[in-house]
């Protein structure tokens, strides 16, 4: 690692004086509008000629020699005095000002000049004395090997820390002429400044080990925030899963809706066909004729215990009852002889079946065969069988 260059106090002092002389050169000269190279300062007219003239004048002013050191400028205004924070024996009695950074009334438009030997302001107000001294002391401390002025001034107070100053009392100031005195001021300066003492870090050699310490534990509220974020992440994941399930279920619901719609259409078709069949066949729904059912019926004896009521008595039935002496005897009910049912007129039904065969059957051979069967039928059951065969052939 390259060593940092060091400078003596004389070299630093020369650099500071050269800089102050340059600043004084520009501050002591009046500002001329034609020396500015900005186009905003050029009046309307021939712009190129005026700009070239301004550049020529600026080059001539830049070629002038710069004053190597700061000189005292004499003015006709009364002189003001200002004191620094150094040794008070350097100035005459009753001349220091309590705070040199406090503005002093001055005529407007005047510049500032300071005599470093006597510490007096020749004209106007000067606000940068302390700043210039502080910068000079900082340069001396950094680039010189000897002790700085700040260290020498603060060596008297062992409790002094960087950033803090001692409490100083101000005396009544004299402005060097007629006028009201500004009075006295007291500036409160703390012993311990805003920047606390920091121990200097010693340089580490190549052989010395590196000190490693565990990282500080996070604050409790940070842990709580992390836990809250994790909980929110879990809830978001669960919500995403539920949303995916809902989307999958919506597809199934759409398919079910389509199936229900098709089923409704099929049911409506079946209902229409059933209505047509009822209109065409309004007779008995069973294929068994009534006569066959009657043949299957058999007489079965029934014993009724207890008193006999008229509701149990059927006319035309053979009943044996017990009289007062418990003797069996035939009942006194009259037997009703059932008459055979009269034959129905099948002409209308035959005409309906012939018309149905003409409408539903397309082949003429089958149609002629069905019509012959209709004319040959003598019972209603035969006509019903023919009707069913016509409907089956039509489907």
Swiss-Prot record:
Keywords: Phosphoprotein, Viral RNA replication. Residues 143-183 are annotated as: Disordered. It comes from the Viruses. Residues 158-172 have a biased composition (Basic and acidic residues). The keyword Phosphoprotein applies. Residues 143-157 have a biased composition (Polar residues). Gene3D superfamilies: 1.20.5.300, DNA helicase RuvA subunit, C-terminal domain. Residues 220-283 are annotated as: Multimerization. The N-terminus consists of a long intrinsically disordered tail. The central part contains the coiled-coil multimerization domain (PMD). Forms a four-stranded coiled coil structure. The C-terminus constitutes the alpha-helical domain that binds to the nucleocapsid (N-RNA complex). Essential cofactor of the RNA polymerase L that plays a central role in the transcription and replication by forming the polymerase complex with RNA polymerase L and recruiting L to the genomic N-RNA template for RNA synthesis. Also plays a central role in the encapsidation of nascent RNA chains by forming the encapsidation complex with the nucleocapsid protein N (N-P complex). Acts as a chaperone for newly synthesized free N protein, so-called N0, allowing encapsidation of nascent RNA chains during replication. Homotetramer. Interacts (via multimerization domain) with polymerase L; this interaction forms the polymerase L-P complex. Interacts (via N-terminus) with N0 (via Ncore); this interaction allows P to chaperon N0 to avoid N polymerization before encapsidation. Interacts (via C-terminus) with N-RNA template; this interaction positions the polymerase on the template for both transcription and replication. Belongs to the rubulavirus/avulavirus P protein family. This is Phosphoprotein. It comes from Simian virus 41 (SV41). The gene is P/V.
């Amino acid at each position: 690692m390259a060593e940092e260059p060091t400078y003596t106090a004389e070299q630093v002092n020369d650099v500071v004086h050269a800089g102050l002389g340059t600043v004084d050169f520009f501050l002591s000269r009046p500002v001329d509008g034609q020396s500015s190279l900005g186009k905003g300062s050029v009046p309307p007219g021939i712009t190129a000629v005026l700009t070239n003239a301004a550049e020529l004048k600026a080059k001539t002013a830049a070629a002038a020699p710069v004053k190597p050191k700061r000189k005292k400028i004499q003015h006709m205004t009364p002189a003001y005095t200002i004191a620094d924070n150094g040794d008070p024996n350097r100035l005459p009695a009753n001349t220091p000002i309590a705070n040199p950074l406090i503005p002093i009334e001055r005529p407007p438009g005047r510049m500032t000049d300071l005599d470093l030997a006597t510490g007096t302001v020749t004209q106007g107000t000067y606000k940068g004395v302390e700043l210039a001294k502080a910068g000079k002391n900082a340069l001396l401390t950094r680039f010189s090997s000897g002790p700085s002025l700040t260290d020498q001034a603060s060596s008297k107070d062992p409790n002094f820390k960087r950033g803090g100053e001692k409490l100083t009392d101000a005396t009544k100031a004299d402005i060097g002429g007629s006028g009201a005195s500004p009075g006295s001021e007291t500036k409160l300066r703390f012993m311990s400044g805003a920047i606390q003492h920091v121990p200097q870090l010693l340089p580490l050699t190549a052989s010395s080990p590196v000190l490693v310490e565990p990282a500080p534990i996070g604050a409790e509220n940070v842990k709580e925030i992390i836990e809250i974020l994790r909980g929110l992440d879990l809830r978001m994941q669960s919500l995403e899963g539920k949303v995916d399930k809902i989307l999958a279920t919506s597809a199934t619901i759409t398919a079910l809706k389509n199936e229900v719609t098709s089923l409704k259409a099929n049911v409506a078709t079946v209902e229409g066909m059933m209505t047509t069949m009822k209109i065409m066949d309004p007779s008995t729904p069973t294929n068994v004729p009534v006569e066959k059912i009657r043949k299957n019926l058999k007489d079965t004896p029934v014993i009724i215990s207890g008193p006999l009521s008229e509701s149990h008595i059927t006319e035309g039935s053979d009943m044996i009852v017990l009289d007062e002496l418990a003797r069996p005897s035939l009942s006194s009910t009259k037997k009703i002889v059932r008459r055979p049912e009269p034959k129905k007129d099948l002409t209308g039904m035959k005409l309906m079946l012939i018309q149905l065969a003409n409408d539903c059957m397309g082949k003429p051979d089958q149609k002629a065969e069905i019509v012959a069967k209709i004319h040959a039928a003598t019972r209603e059951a035969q006509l019903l069988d023919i009707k069913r065969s016509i409907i089956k052939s039509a489907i």
